[in-house]
Amino acid sequence: MIETRYIPKLGRSVTRLGLGALPMGPLQRKLTPREGAEVVRAAVASGITFIDTATMYGTYEHIALGLRGWNGTVTIATKTHAQKDRSMAREHVEKALKGLDRDRIDIMLCHCARSAFTEELWGPSLETLVSARENGTIGMVGISTHSIQSVRAAARHPEIDVIHPLINMKGMGIIDGTTDEMLEAIREAHAAGKFIYAMKSLAGGNFVTDREKALRFVFDCEEIDAVMVGMVTPLEVEWNVRFLSGLPVSDELSEKTALQSKVLSIVELACIGCGECVEHCENGALSIVDGKARVDHGLCILCGYCAPHCERLSIRIV
């Protein structure tokens, strides 16, 4: 059985292992809605009851199709990237309701990512989400962030219910400190009553060759209520569920979900074309084209040496 955590404000429990929907969508693996739906259905059929997505991920259709006809309760979290824009935030709420085919959004976050959580940038969107929570359209509101200071600011904010921070064993992607400092901020936020669900435990797939250690590092932190793990095949769902439930994992399943099944992907929305990855690629597989990093998959050997040099965590192995 997958471990669960109870969320008082929703009146239900969620599995600590959640399905992260970013990698399956057009920004990364580019699964069709039907292919993505197979992953979603495999996840819920395996007992996963928590899914994370966002307006910009383009995966609402994948999720809605995967849940069509499913009778179990599934909690979905999504995000708005609207800054200083109440109108856009309202549009994102309506888009989520329609796209996910729901009459209520369980959790909706300000998609801060690498931007600071400040009243100037995010106040209007947060106010919009809070209003939607008050009228029953949204269950809980909060932020997603790669920043320690933003976690701390959200922990002090009286309207924040949920914090979705970046945390992994090497601190890859944290923009303003170390793993230990982020863990300290997470513990403070949890003590303040915030529901914490983590992202990037595998650093965008870069720790897939050491996934057992990477997953245990995050799941063993009691202050982290749940962890989103990106999965793009039913076999990956099976591996994660079995491993985190303490069930035997066959060598065959491990081999089928290992590095050989992955590809290097650049998140273009995050990439600024700085060229650091190109400089550190010893195989000539990376170049800058039209201001963005590009991968020659014929030359890429998935060594992952480029990823630590990307300050924006734009390089993913999916």
Task: Please tell me what each predicted stretch does.
Residues 97-116:
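Active-site groove signature of glycoside hydrolases
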Residues 1-74:
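N-terminal binding-site loop/beta-alpha segment at the start of enzyme catalytic domains
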Residues 7, 19, 43, 51, ...:
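Conserved, mostly hydrophobic/aromatic
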Residues 55, 276-294, 305-318:
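Iron-sulfur cluster-binding cysteine motifs and their immediate structural context
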Residues 74-85, 108-111:
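A short, structured active-site edge motif that brings together acidic residues
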Residues 8-14, 45, 63-74, 94-103, ...:
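Acidic (Asp/Glu)-rich catalytic clusters
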Residues 29-43, 85-101, 145-153, 209-217:
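Short, acidic/polar
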Residues 4, 113-262, 268, 276, ...:
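Beta/alpha (TIM)-barrel catalytic core signal, keyed to glycine-rich beta->alpha loops juxtaposed to Asp/Glu
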